[in-house]
Regions:
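Non-transmembrane, aqueous-exposed alpha-helical and coiled segments at domain scale
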Residues: 1-118
Length: 119
């Protein structure tokens, strides 16, 4: 199972079987609209950003309440862009362990572009 399978439209039953929540929106359409008409550039590409603001935007995209993604820029640790964003087409896995012991697994695809602030 690879995140690139999701972007390429190869949504195998294996993802659903394993309990992953997948994006319900057209990732490429959101990416194109964000590139043409950007509305949010976020500085700071760390885990808190990916787990909270990016995940909330992902939910808004899933429900059709919003139609653009976020562009993230990093000004300190460029390695996060080079190793955690770009190799995975800017998608992330959000895994939450709930107090009941249930594990929630979600693919976050709301980040449409990742930049080093020097670019």
């Amino acid at each position: 199972m690879k995140l690139s399978e999701i972007k390429n439209g190869n949504l195998s039953a294996e993802w659903a079987e394993k309990g992953y929540e997948l994006p319900k929106f057209d990732i490429e359409a959101v990416k194109a609209k964000t590139h043409a008409e950007p509305t949010w550039v976020h500085f700071g590409a760390g885990n808190i950003f990916r787990a909270f603001p990016a995940a909330i935007l992902n939910d808004a995209l899933n429900t059709g309440k919003y139609d653009r993604g976020v562009i993230v820029a990093e000004s300190f640790d460029y390695e996060i862009i080079d190793k955690a964003y770009r190799p995975y087409d800017n998608m992330s896995l959000l895994v939450c362990l709930k107090s009941t012991g249930e594990i929630e697994k979600k693919v976050v695809a709301s980040v449409t572009e990742s930049l080093r602030s020097e670019e």
